[in-house]
Amino acid sequence: MKDWSAKQYLKFEDERSRPARDLLAQIPVDKPRKVVDIGCGPGNSTELLVERWPEADVSGFDTSPDMIEKAKVRLPKVDFTIGDVASYEPDAETDVLFSNAVFQWLPDHIKQMKRLLSLLRPGAVLAVQMPDNMGEQTHVGMRDVAKTEAFAAKIGAKGRGPLPPVMEYYNALAGQAARLDIWHTVYNHPLDGVDAIVEWVKATGLRPFLDPLDEQEQADYLKAYKARIAPHYPVAVDGKVLLRFPRIFLVVQKR
């Protein structure tokens, strides 16, 4: 895919940071030596880690140069680098691996979680949050529009698959865990109409669908996409629409 846009991503910074705050609140580590933000984005989640553990060595990495550039401006004292979770290996001092909305992009993410856990010392924590929204109308609509005659040839079969069942995560990780906490949360974000929903997903889920298209085709796709999802997001009494957004959380403390 093309590079991520930090500017587009940060249009809904507070809403995107809330799951990171909720994940952070459940990490059972008081005084970590080293904390790593996997897929740190523009640094909004890293900032939360610095605030909770000001004495720790906090760092972050991301595959996107644009995201890393923005993160360095936001937190100039934090070490940010371009990197990929698939090749990352934590060192012996790492007490917390934190990841907000990254692992869902990896088809083998359970394998990667097990690999990272195997490299952590006992008592260290892997904390992960992933969107679990492939069945939501935002994402069903993406695929439906991509299948239409106007776009099928260029877009093809895009988007990631649904996440595995919770039991699959539990069975895969329990053998390495002294403590394993898994839960779902469904957020209902009040947004300023369907246009705002489109702006939200343009930064993330829509990217694989838009990247193969030229500028005019992108405009046509977005018009068709908006028309496809609009009936599923009725307007509330105050003019808002509610974006339903399920997410799964995992906090694994190494045995």
Curated annotation (Swiss-Prot):
The keyword Methyltransferase applies. It comes from the Bacteria. The keyword NADP does not apply. One of its GO terms (molecular function) is trans-aconitate 2-methyltransferase activity. One of its GO terms (cellular component) is cytoplasm. It is found in: Cytoplasm. Its EC number is 2.1.1.144. Keywords: Cytoplasm, Methyltransferase, S-adenosyl-L-methionine, Transferase. It catalyses: trans-aconitate + S-adenosyl-L-methionine = (E)-3-(methoxycarbonyl)pent-2-enedioate + S-adenosyl-L-homocysteine. InterPro entries: SAM-dependent_MTases_sf, Trans-aconitate_MeTrfase, Trans_acon_MeTrfase_C. It is an enzyme of class 2 (transferase). GO terms for biological process: methylation. Its main location: cytoplasm. Belongs to the methyltransferase superfamily. Tam family. Catalyzes the S-adenosylmethionine monomethyl esterification of trans-aconitate. This is Trans-aconitate 2-methyltransferase. It comes from Brucella anthropi (strain ATCC 49188 / DSM 6882 / CCUG 24695 / JCM 21032 / LMG 3331 / NBRC 15819 / NCTC 12168 / Alc 37).
